[in-house]
Amino acid sequence: MSWTPFVDSQFVAPSNGLIQKGLIMGRDGTVWGVSDGWAVTAQEAKNLAGQVANPSSVPASGITLGGVKYMGLVADEENFQGFSSSKKQGVSGVVLKSAVIIGLFGEPHKNPNAYSFLKGVADSLVNAGTLQ
């Protein structure tokens, strides 16, 4: 099953422009669904899975998704954020037991808003029993 339709219809579209692109991947680095136009490679997803398992590595190494390197701002067992000043965009992610939910946001929207929105999506999926 591809999660791409869910990504676009349930957290990109309803975010009213806050989340520009989305990605859901397994904790093993397997891409489940990604928005069209966000060319996240299998290797980038695998690298991110390693960073999720070792969040202290994010501030030093940054996060690379879709060919863009984001400076790692914060990372812990539950979330991470990164920002690219050259691209004027950032990434925010929510870490679950089985999956990672990631959103790409633009500079006008600061990462706490993106994280809060994505956390709401993640909580809904967990509460529905869809993900853990």
UniProtKB/Swiss-Prot annotation:
Principal location class: cytoplasm
InterPro entries in the cross-refs: PFN (IPR048278), PFN_euk (IPR005455), PFN_sf (IPR036140)
Subcellular location: Cytoplasm, Cytoskeleton
GO molecular function annotations of the record: actin monomer binding
Keywords recorded for this protein, A-Z: Actin-binding, Cytoplasm, Cytoskeleton
CC terms in the record's Gene Ontology section: cell cortex; cytoskeleton
Family annotation (Pfam families): Profilin
Similarity field: Belongs to the profilin family.
Assembly and binders: Occurs in many kinds of cells as a complex with monomeric actin in a 1:1 ratio.
Purpose: Binds to actin and affects the structure of the cytoskeleton. At high concentrations, profilin prevents the polymerization of actin, whereas it enhances it at low concentrations. By binding to PIP2, it inhibits the formation of IP3 and DG.
Protein name (database record): Profilin
The organism of origin for this protein: Naegleria pringsheimi
Taxonomic lineage: Eukaryota, Discoba, Heterolobosea, Tetramitia, Eutetramitia
